[in-house]
């Protein structure tokens, strides 16, 4: 049995985790075991789709790979960021020469921003209860 050539990358953003497999192909997309025409059918919002496939666009590899993505946790926005980082890391496995391009567009950097925890005595992380003088 022939070994299937594939490239793997993991991405995280907020509480979302994406495991991305790139396989040489013609641009098919499979997210969480379900086939999609494009990533836009999964993310719905074109901005999130554009954000997720940006690494493929800047490296001119759009349509050269089939995407198999397992993503869970967070909302669609966080998942989009996680998929983006996963694709970028998988592209590095495919070709190390893409590193300067991906680095230039800051696609290899994990966004460290997380939700700040709620503190007791406050309504939210920083929102204090309304103050009344009388």
UniProtKB/Swiss-Prot annotation:
InterPro entries, per the entry: Ribosomal_Su5_D2-typ_SF (IPR020568), Ribosomal_uS9 (IPR000754), Ribosomal_uS9_bac/plastid (IPR023035), Ribosomal_uS9_CS (IPR020574), Ribsml_uS5_D2-typ_fold_subgr (IPR014721)
Q: According to the UniProt record, where is the region Disordered? A: 113-134
From its record, what is one biological process in GO terms?
A: translation
Which domain of life does the protein's organism represent?
Answer: Bacteria
Q: Which Gene3D superfamilies match?
A: 3.30.230.10
Drop me one GO molecular function for this one: RNA binding
Enumerate the UniProt keywords alphabetically: Ribonucleoprotein, Ribosomal protein
List the GO cellular component terms: cytosolic small ribosomal subunit
The family line of this record is: Belongs to the universal ribosomal protein uS9 family.
- Its protein name is Small ribosomal subunit protein uS9
Give the organism, scientific name.
Thermotoga maritima (strain ATCC 43589 / DSM 3109 / JCM 10099 / NBRC 100826 / MSB8)
